[in-house]
Amino acid sequence: MLACPLQHLMSYASSIVALSERVSAFSAEGKDYLQAEAAICGQEPVTVLLRAYADSVAAKALADRNPGDRLIVSGEASLQQPDGDVPIITASVVSSAFDDQYLNEVVIVGRIGSDAKDAESGKSTRRSVAVNRFYRSPDPAAQEPIEVTDWFSIRAFGFTKDRLTAADVGALVEINGCFTQMTNAEGKPYSEVKARMVRVHRGSKGGSNPAAGTSAVGYDHESFQGQPDECPINW
C-alpha cells in the first residue's frame, strides 16, 4: 500500500502477457525502445504494447522472444497517444511465465478529471483519472520538458463505486485494479481499469473473471466490490 500523503503521480502495471508479434525497434518521445504488441493472458485478453528502453537489461531479455512466448512483465503504465485506447507497459522487469499463471495488476496515482458516469444498470460507475508524464523535447533549444497527460478510464463496482463517486473532481486518488478491454459503439476496442480498491488521498464487463481456468485467485467479480468496513471515503 502506498504511504499517505502522496506528492507525485504515477502509474505502474505488472502482468503476464503473450507476445502477438516479433519484437522490433521503435522510437517515441525522443527515446529508443524495443516494442511488440502483446495480450494480457486470460479468458478476456487485453491488447497492450510492450516496450523496453533499448539500452536496458529488460530490452536484452525481450530481444530474442518470439510470438506466443508468455512473459511476466512489470513497469510504467501509460496510454498510446493520441487516442489513449491501448495501454503501454514499459517494462523494467521481464521473466518467463507458465501457461497456468495469471497476473494483471495496475496501480494508478492521479487526479480525478471528470464527473462520475453511471452505467445504465446502475451497478458500476466510470471516471477518468489523469497522470502526467514528462519527457525531454527533441528541440535542443527547448528549456522546458514536454508534458503528456494519460487519461485512465476507471470502472468501479459496489462499495468501491461509492468511494469513487464521492471523490471530488481534482482529488488525488490511488487506484488498484486490473486492465480490461471494452468495445465502443463503433466496435473499436479501448481499455478500462477495473478498480479493486479506491483510496482518496487529498480532496480539492463487470461480472466475469478474466483469470478463469488458471491457478490465480483474487480476480473474481466479488473481489472488486470493496468492503463496507474499509477506510472511510474521506480517509
Describe each PLM feature range.
Residues 1-13, 20-32, 39-45, 49, ...:
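Acidic, gly/ser/pro-rich intrinsically disordered tails
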Residues 61-67, 76-83, 97-101:
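Short, charge-rich binding segments
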Residues 68-82, 171-183:
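Flexible glycine-rich surface loops and low-complexity tracts that mediate binding to linear polymers
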Residues 85-90:
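Short, compact, well-ordered microdomains
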